[in-house]
Amino acid sequence: MSITYNPDDPLYADADDVSREIDRVFDICHGCRVCFSLCPSFTDLFNSIDAHDGRVSELTPEERDGVISECYQCKLCALRCPYVPPHEWLLDFPKLMLRAAIQKKNSDPPPFHVRLADSVMSRTDLSGRFATAFSGLVNPVVTSKGGLIRKAMESVSGIASQRLLPPYAKRRFSTWFKRDHVANRTATGNPGREKTDNPMRSVALFPTCFVEYMDPEIGKDLVGVLEHAGASCTLPSGTQCCGAPWLHSGHIEQFRQTAAKNIEALRESATNGAQVIVPQATCAYVMRKDYPELIDSSDARVVADAVREPMEYLIGLRKGNRDLFDSLFPPLQKEGSADGADNDLSIVYHVSCHTQAQGVGLKARDLFGVLGFSVKLVNKCAGIDGTWGYKSKNYALAKKVAQPMKRAIDDAAPREVCGDCHLANYAILEETGLRSVHPIQILARAYGIRSD
């Protein structure tokens, strides 16, 4: 038996070794059960073990495969588990489930249509470039959930035809930044937009697929707020999708190739002390945690150490110079925002799984509190977690997973909902009918900030 999560280890995808490790971990989990309510994997695992009078060795292959396929890599169990490293048992349930899925894929390759769907879903930059160029034709199809064309697309892409999908933008974020914003910055000479020798105020933007191709308005608000705070924003060339779809579908080599390109694109900025701002929780998690583990290089570690989510970066600025920050972002009053607009300052903040899994705390909640907002947390999974909840084979279960989140938001009856995960935000819209925005957009509106 080998406790390895290194894909280069010869035993990583060895069927017998994986099976023995699954027995070991399932037996430990059976005796602990602290994660019993987290996800369908644990519910089915414990029910199946109980049906066999507590004997893990008697689980059927189908029962094991069900537990593996229902793990959507939310990582929350790893946060709760008392037996993760450095404990001597070295337990890491999500990594083992990924290892088991990869071993099964290697020993029993899925049918062609599944492999095709994984490939299509993982090539987000290719589809994004095409869709933004032809958004007028693509959007009526993409947004017509349950339609005939979406059903036909499901067989190729693997994306559930019933799932609400975001439309594509007419213009990419990078196009706006390079052609419009940089030119305007040069023309105006705004002091808050000049180069700085302070590393904390030098940021490299990693826009993510969603901001780049689907909602560049988030990126514009992000740039506006960062520059209002005195940061100098750059957009390094050569970045692409973080690689999460490849990783979560078990294609390690494709993930490594993608990660290596992003590391190379961001290496110089990170080495020079710039913070890498990533406005999407899943992408930030992958770059922080998976890059240095699966790309064992000093550059990968430098980039990972530089990654920050937007609200995390801003609250870091405040810790560095509270007086300056508070002069730029004075606490808001209950009767209105900084520019006098009506605002009751009451918001619901959805805490995504991958926000929690990064282990840096709830920085959006903390900053909102400092600025005078009244924040209600909804700490329930949206059932998306990367691409898992978008796949047709997982759709029914994903909807079930999302119901506690829906009930919590409905009960809060919020005027405003926000969350760091764009995919979860669309699940919120689908489940509740309420549009959830990125926290940075709440700040931009409250302080009347807009980037030209």
Where in the sequence are the language-model features?
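A structural signal for alpha-helical segments
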Residues: 17-20, 59-62, 88, 298, ...
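Cysteine-centered iron-sulfur cluster-binding motifs in ferredoxin-type domains/subunits
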Residues: 21-42, 63-87, 91, 100, ...
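Non-heme iron-sulfur electron-transfer modules
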Residues: 1-12, 37-70, 84-115, 437-443
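Generic signal for short, ordered secondary-structure residues
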Residues: 8, 17-18, 50, 60, ...
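Asp/Glu-centered strand-loop micro-motifs enriched in Gly/Pro and often flanked by an aromatic residue
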Residues: 9-30, 59
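Iron-sulfur cluster-binding electron-transfer modules in prokaryotic oxidoreductases
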Residues: 91-452
